[in-house]
Amino acid sequence: MLRVALAKGRLLKSFIEYLQQVNQIDIATVLLNRQRQLLLTVDNIEMILVKGSDVPTYVEQGIADVGIVGSDILNGQKYNINKLLDLPFGKCHFALAAKPETSRYKKVATSYVHTATQFFNKEGMDVEVIHLNGSVELSCVVDMVDAIVDIVQTGSTLTANGLVEKKHISEINAKLITNKESYFKQSSEIERLIKQLGVSINYA
């Protein structure tokens, strides 16, 4: 039995849509009908649903053999895992966003401090980065900050709050990661999963 850790939320929705596209209907159906279950089994695969930022930890600790997680999570911290595959879903990007008239950024809010700090340092910008856990758009709307750094998929949330994208920072996509020991001990099961997903190994 192969245990796979899946990130809940936006990425899980994108994963289910992708499973339907590649005709893995059984797995997609189980995930769609999960209700509040956090542990599901189908086709000799046990899936555990966890917070995105926890997926690498579950894999690193050997609780899960495989994980599917956003590349943004992996960029913020070092994990003792195999970053095996880029996956063709969960595509979005980090962006700097603000009100249309804003051109100077002294104070910026984000849930992704590492990415934001890295970006501003690279740009040579002296910016105070404020950490928020959610609804970062509001901080800009009420003028607590000049801008935000956030994940953008369609841009509809920015538009709904009167904000525009000022700078495209970096791309994000789903990654398949494995526990280092499981990669050898359960190589055939992992290869089978990769074939089911219709992707090939590129050692990303």
Curated annotation (Swiss-Prot):
Question: Which InterPro entries does the protein's record reference?
Answer: ATP_PRibTrfase_cat (IPR013820), ATP_PRibTrfase_HisG (IPR001348), ATP_PRibTrfase_HisG_short (IPR024893)
Which SUPFAM superfamilies did the record assign? Periplasmic binding protein-like II
Catalysed reaction equations from the record: 1-(5-phospho-beta-D-ribosyl)-ATP + diphosphate = 5-phospho-alpha-D-ribose 1-diphosphate + ATP
Q: What is its main location?
A: cytoplasm
Highest taxon in the source lineage: Bacteria
Reported EC number(s) for this entry are: 2.4.2.17
Give an example GO biological process: L-histidine biosynthetic process
Instruction: Say if the entry is tagged with keyword ATP-binding.
Output: yes
Location comes to:
Cytoplasm
Query: One GO CC term of this entry?
Result: cytoplasm
Which pathway does it operate in? Answer: Amino-acid biosynthesis; L-histidine biosynthesis; L-histidine from 5-phospho-alpha-D-ribose 1-diphosphate: step 1/9
> Which keywords has UniProt assigned to this entry?
Amino-acid biosynthesis, ATP-binding, Cytoplasm, Glycosyltransferase, Histidine biosynthesis, Nucleotide-binding, Transferase
Gene Ontology molecular functions: ATP binding; ATP phosphoribosyltransferase activity
Q: Which residues cross the membrane?
A: none
Under the heading PANTHER family, the entry gives: ATP PHOSPHORIBOSYLTRANSFERASE, ATP PHOSPHORIBOSYLTRANSFERASE ATP-PRTASE
NCBIfam families given for it?
hisG
The record's note on quaternary structure and interaction partners says: Heteromultimer composed of HisG and HisZ subunits.
Q: What does this protein do?
A: Catalyzes the condensation of ATP and 5-phosphoribose 1-diphosphate to form N'-(5'-phosphoribosyl)-ATP (PR-ATP). Has a crucial role in the pathway because the rate of histidine biosynthesis seems to be controlled primarily by regulation of HisG enzymatic activity.
- State the domain notes: Lacks the C-terminal regulatory region which is replaced by HisZ.
Q: What does the sequence similarity comment in the record state about its family?
A: Belongs to the ATP phosphoribosyltransferase family. Short subfamily.
Name used for this protein in its record = ATP phosphoribosyltransferase
Gene this chain is encoded by: hisG
